[in-house]
Amino acid sequence: MISYLASIFLLATVSAVPSGRVEVVFPSVETSRSGVKTVKFTALDQDVELKLRSAGEILGKRFAIQDVDVESLRRKIYRDSVNGAALLIDEDGPLTIEGIVNSKLRIQPFESGRITKDGIIAHQIVEVIDDKKSYDRVAVIPENVKRNAENVSRMARDDDCIVVEYYIVTDSAFTKRFKSNSALTNYVTVMFTGVQNLMDTLELGIGVRLLGVTTFTEKTEPSFIKDNLIPGPPAAFDPDVLISAMSKYYCNHQTGLAKDTDLIFLITARGMGDPREDGTVDINTAGIANSAGVCKPCFKSGIATDDSDYNERVDTLAHESVHLLGSPHDGEGPNLVSLEGSPGAANCPAKAGYIMGNRNDKNKYKFSPCTKKCVEYLLSKPTASCIFQQCTDF
């Protein structure tokens, strides 16, 4: 049986609760000859102008999910990495826009859908605020696994591209929030388009790809979910137990997308935290992942909670992804990285406020120089070979 050392860190996270500030707008969209879309509107004291480029590559070439028109979805994905925008723009009928405008604003078609101005339907802008803190955890892989992980198939070539492929599974609580697979896939696509924006701040040329999504229901949830749910109330998980069980499950079920992918993420709408003696759970954990687990069949798992409608956990998914890519929290040394020789992040204090630290307004949507060095170190090792692909392959 594999045992883990869990590193726990206080992580400021956005809880996507409306601040009370909501405004109806009629956004304009212009498309240049190069395909760049300019979206403009004024809302909540902000003049917003986004320069959006197609981001259809977020969906892998063979991405598929039941009842979803993948090629149609691919054409609708746009992002502005400078402003952190991740949007689905549908111009097949009346213009609709949904997704992340920036760190504080979200956009979606107005509920009635009947209000129009100059042929443009009304959209709702919602402001989200940071209203709580929660813990993040990282499971440190034992020493014997660290040493054995270097035995992989091939080294990267100089002309390869760095592409991190994700397989997403959702628990029944997350799945039933959505009316259809299409609505869930739209949400997850926006989420990982936002993750790509944050990965860009590493300036390492890392691409994000979704290979597929499996939406579990109460009837189809695998044992690692069912057997480890604490009834509560509310029903919740012990994150350390769940990540261990998930890792073991996929270690023993290396087939299909679970075998092909670089990372497997569970998205749950249930909470995670520390069990109390009375059978309830202190909900305090946003996410957990295995340290430097990328490309390791038995350790490439991560978990993120998401219990709202406004895609507030993009930062959590990026944070957990970077744990899997070899970075500890800012302020932590190499002893908390499951990769021999890692530089660690002790030279970057948590109070500097980056994504892997305690996050302040200046730096909370960027990674620290130490995080970049840790990820660069992992990329230099043969253990990371699975995320290097020939640039013509995607």
Curated annotation (Swiss-Prot):
Zn(2+) binds at residues 319, 323, 329. One of its GO terms (biological process) is membrane protein ectodomain proteolysis. Its EC number is 3.4.24.-. It is found in: Secreted. The active site is at 320. The keyword Calcium does not apply. Contains 4 disulfide bonds. GO terms for cellular component: extracellular region. Disulfide bonds join 295-386. Residues 162-391 form the Peptidase M12B domain. The keyword Zinc applies. Residues 1-16 form the signal peptide. It holds the Pfam family Reprolysin_5. Expressed by the venom gland. Inhibited by EDTA. Residues 17-157 form a propeptide. Binds 1 zinc ion per subunit. PANTHER family: ADAM A DISINTEGRIN AND METALLOPROTEASE DOMAIN (PTHR11905), ADAM METALLOPROTEASE (PTHR11905:SF159). Belongs to the venom metalloproteinase (M12B) family. Acts as a metalloprotease. Penetrates intact tissue and specifically cleaves the vesicle-associated membrane protein 2 (VAMP2) (part of the SNARE complex) involved in pancreatic secretion, thus disrupting the normal vesicular traffic. This is Venom metalloproteinase antarease TserMP_A.
